[in-house]
């Protein structure tokens, strides 16, 4: 196994929290993600552990959305808030991010909050790194417009 579970738990939790916007639900999904990962028949031989964890977590988040049909408002700020605070108030950023599609918001959160490598995000979204870079630039451009800022991240 290329990475330890402890190293990735916080990243997967933040990802789940950003997706479902409810602390307890994110904790449950994160735990279920790691249980399913460990139950995977060949988890010791998986080269792309992070990608598998995010895929499992994403599927569980989608299942949760299907159950509830609506996402709850966040109870408190996600753990990756240092970036938000250094650029602008968390409230302004949350408003701007809310204007993005779910997939665009997920891409930005994975890249800039969870610091997931581009190649992993590209594989999760079935696109090339080139297409992902172009899409991120497009998303950041829209965020700049929404915020009226010259620099964002």
Predicted regions and their residues:
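A short, charge-rich alpha-helical start-of-domain segment used by transcription regulators
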Residues: 1-14, 18, 27
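Acidic, proline/glycine-rich intrinsically disordered inter-domain spacer in sigma factors
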Residues: 67, 73-98
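Arg/Lys-rich amphipathic alpha helix in sigma70-family domain 2
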Residues: 55-75
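Structural recognition of an alpha-helix C-terminal capping motif at a helix-to-coil junction
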Residues: 14, 28-35, 39, 47-59
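A short pre-motif secondary-structure segment
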Residues: 107-111
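C-terminal flanking helix
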Residues: 13, 34, 101, 105, ...
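DNA-recognition helix of helix-turn-helix
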Residues: 119, 123-151
């Amino acid at each position: 196994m290329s990475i330890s579970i402890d190293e990735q738990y916080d990243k997967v939790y933040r990802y789940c929290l950003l997706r479902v916007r409810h602390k307890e639900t994110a904790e449950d999904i994160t735990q279920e993600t790691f249980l399913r990962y460990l139950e995977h028949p060949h988890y010791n031989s998986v080269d792309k552990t992070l990608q598998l964890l995010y895929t499992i977590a994403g599927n569980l988040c989608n299942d949760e959305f299907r159950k509830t049909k609506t996402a709850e408002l966040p109870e408190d700020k996600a753990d990756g808030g240092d970036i938000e605070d250094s650029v602008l108030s968390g409230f302004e950023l949350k408003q701007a991010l809310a204007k993005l599609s779910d997939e665009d918001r997920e891409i930005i959160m994975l890249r800039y909050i969870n610091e997931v490598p581009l190649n992993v995000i590209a594989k999760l979204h079935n696109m090339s790194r080139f297409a992902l870079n172009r899409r991120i630039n497009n998303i950041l451009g829209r965020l700049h417009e929404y915020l009226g800022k010259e620099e964002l991240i």
